[in-house]
Curated annotation (Swiss-Prot):
Lineage of source species: Bacteria, Pseudomonadati, Pseudomonadota, Gammaproteobacteria, Vibrionales
Top-level division of the source organism's lineage: Bacteria
Protein name: Elongation factor 4
Role: Required for accurate and efficient protein synthesis under certain stress conditions. May act as a fidelity factor of the translation reaction, by catalyzing a one-codon backward translocation of tRNAs on improperly translocated ribosomes. Back-translocation proceeds from a post-translocation (POST) complex to a pre-translocation (PRE) complex, thus giving elongation factor G a second chance to translocate the tRNAs correctly. Binds to ribosomes in a GTP-dependent manner.
Species whose genome carries this gene: Aliivibrio fischeri (strain MJ11) (Vibrio fischeri)
Keyword Nucleotide-binding recorded: yes
SMART domains (alphabetical): EFG_C
A GO term from the CC aspect: plasma membrane
Membrane topology of the entry: Peripheral membrane protein
Record CDD domains: EF4_II (cd03699), EF4_III (cd16260), LepA (cd01890), lepA_C (cd03709)
Catalysis performed (reactions): GTP + H2O = GDP + phosphate + H(+)
Pfam family, one: LepA_C
Length: 597
């Protein structure tokens, strides 16, 4: 056991986590050169296309150190985006140490800080590594000082490497063996195995990634899932070298995968404990905190026949992504679907894209909203995650919106732009600290402003240099209103949005203008209105198509023309009373882009 090292690789987006993982796999011979590919751990098509890590992946490698001993390295490559921070905290729970990878050109960024603090809170050994030292812009000495000043870890002897060229990777491996402690645990105690992650395989059922804390697991063992008390037999057991390889046993301190033929999606939840059915342990391991979704949106299948498939797909996906929340919802405009909770807008995009690709579904998304705390006149407290659930105005006492504490790291040159962006987003400054050329800003900004497009705007105002990390702080009373959209006088529930009173007029006008572009012209006028309660705040009209009925009158009497025009007008009026307007998918998406341009 003293030759096992469990560690995660944590870093900000694009600081080279996945590339470093590739080099470690290559040096330790986990894959042959023929099988090696760039970012070999990013196995999802989506991850490769976007160049980001979404799922944490684990790998077991054998490394012969310079002292002649062979060490087993279990490491987990984690995502860098703030939307996937839950993946990171889960991965860290299975480790004794973490490699903090910092780009020697970019320096410390907000996500570096957030992930590093998570690791320190869990009592992990954090080992700083300066990556990308082959770049002309690299300044490792400055960055080492920055790590010490901002993060508070001594980085004077930090290992310097370039994951792309392979320079210094051997030193990284030696540092891992020397600096990261071996796992603790008792091989003879009753078995306790923590489920770090699980996914659904169409042939094998539920596959669980586990870390053995005490005891061991063997093939054909009878095991019990502690939360449900169900007993299963282990069909297959093994490790990833990134390839899935079968073994006969997993010992204390090791990380590997287990297949028990569980077909029920809820059969082995993430964060649960596995033990032997006979003579197993009594206590569960402390799992993970449940994360609260920050953004909610309705997802509806375009064709109602897909509803069952959609439900199954969501179930399988939520097994793999424990931070996804969903509950059934119905809408007059869109039929049956689900109200889903996400950690942020990127998370929402990724989930929608995964559902459409992996499960072949066509989906419509409604406007994302955050959760509001609503106080009614009779003193009752409600939590509202959808504009359609907001009670009538005369029943409301006050609406409280969630406030996010945002930590922003930005180079001093772009400070002015970033501050004006925060003010525009109704932010309140809490703190501002200079660290050399970097400025650490702390702002309290309403969550609804943060999740919509704050991240994109922050990147564009700072030319990509500013970085952001945010978490929910508190609820605060605010003047929020619901803006309804009426098409020819009928409310469309799926198009309503909740926004601040000061922005309502502007957003209402933008919304109706955007919708006008997407609704095709009909044989009658279509009035698109935005309203707060009964008060109309904006309107635009999609003009009717009309035939030139007087084309056949050559000259002739004006009364003849008037008669024909009047007849046409009456026909249009009749049509408008009975005509229905078909809203295309793009009209629903128009909401998502309001305020972005």
């Amino acid at each position: 056991m003293k030759h096992i090292r469990n560690f995660s690789i944590i870093a900000h987006i694009d600081h080279g986590k996945s590339t470093l993982s590739d080099r470690l796999i290559q040096v330790c011979g986990g894959l042959s050169d023929r099988e090696m590919a760039a970012q070999v751990l990013d196995s999802m098509d989506l991850e490769r296309e976007r160049g980001i890590t979404i799922k944490a992946q684990s790998v077991t490698l054998d490394y012969t150190a310079k002292d002649g001993e062979t060490y087993q390295l279990n490491f987990i490559d984690t995502p860098g985006h703030v939307d996937f921070s839950y993946e990171v905290s889960r991965s860290l729970a299975a480790c004794e140490g973490a490699l903090l990878v910092v780009d020697a050109g970019q320096g410390v960024e907000a996500q570096t800080l957030a992930n590093c603090y998570t690791a320190i809170e869990m009592d992990l050994e954090v080992v700083p590594i300066l990556n990308k030292i082959d770049l002309p812009a690299a300044d490792p000495d400055r960055v080492a000082e920055e790590i010490e000043e901002i993060v508070g870890i001594d980085a004077t002897d930090a290992t310097r490497c370039s994951a792309k060229t392979g320079l210094g990777v051997d030193e990284v491996l030696e540092t891992i063996v020397k600096s990261i402690p071996a796992p603790e645990g008792d091989p003879d105690a009753p078995t306790q195995a923590l489920i770090i992650d699980s996914w659904f395989d169409n042939y094998l059922g539920v596959v669980s990634l586990v870390r053995i804390k005490n005891g061991s697991l063997k093939k054909n063992d009878k095991i019990k899932v502690m939360s449900t008390g169900q007993v299963w037999g282990i069909d297959r057991i093994g490790i990833f070298t990134p390839k899935q390889i079968d073994t006969d046993v997993l010992n204390t301190g090791e990380v590997g995968w287990v297949v028990c033929g569980i077909k029920d999606i809820l059969g082995a939840p993430v964060g649960d404990t596995l033990t032997h059915a006979k003579g197993g342990c009594e206590e569960r391991l402390p799992g993970f905190q449940k994360v609260k979704p920050q953004v909610y949106a309705g997802l509806f299948p375009v064709s109602s026949d897909d509803y069952e498939n959609f439900r199954d797909a969501l179930g399988k996906l939520s097994l793999n992504d424990a931070s996804l929340f969903y509950e059934p919802e119905s809408s007059a405009a869109l039929g049956f679907g689900f109200r889903c909770g996400f950690l942020g807008m990127l998370h929402m995009e990724i989930i929608q894209e995964r559902l459409e690709r992996e499960y072949d579904l066509d989906l419509i998304t409604t406007a994302p909203t955050v959760v509001y705390e609503v106080v009614l006149n009779n003193g009752d407290l409600l939590y509202v995650d959808s504009p359609s659930k907001l009670p009538a105005v005369n029943d409301l006492d006050e609406i409280r919106e969630p406030i996010a504490r945002c930590n922003i790291l930005v180079p001093a040159d772009y400070l002015g732009n970033v501050i004006s962006l925060c003010v525009e987003k109704r932010g309140v400054q809490v703190d501002m600290v200079y660290h050399g050329n970097q400025v650490a800003l702390t702002y309290d900004i309403p969550m609804s402003e943060v999740v919509l497009d704050f991240f994109d705007r922050l990147k564009s105002t700072s030319r990509g240099y500013a970085s952001l990390d945010y978490n929910f702080q508190r609820y605060e009373a605010s003047n929020m209103v619901r803006v309804d959209v009426l098409i020819n006088g009928d409310r469309v529930d799926a198009l309503a949005i909740i926004t601040h009173h000061d922005n309502a007029q502007g957003r209402g006008r933008l919304l109706v203008e955007k919708m006008k572009e997407f609704i095709p012209r009909q044989m009658f006028d279509i009035a698109i209105q935005a309203a707060i309660g009964a008060h109309i705040i904006a309107r635009s009209t999609v003009k009717q198509l009309r035939k030139n009925v007087i084309a056949k009158c050559y000259g002739g009497d004006i009364s003849r023309k008037k008669k024909l025009l009047k007849k046409q007008k009456e026909g249009k009026k009749r049509m408008k009373q009975i005509g229905n307007v078909e809203l295309p998918q793009e009209a629903f998406l128009a909401i998502l882009h309001v305020g972005k341009d």
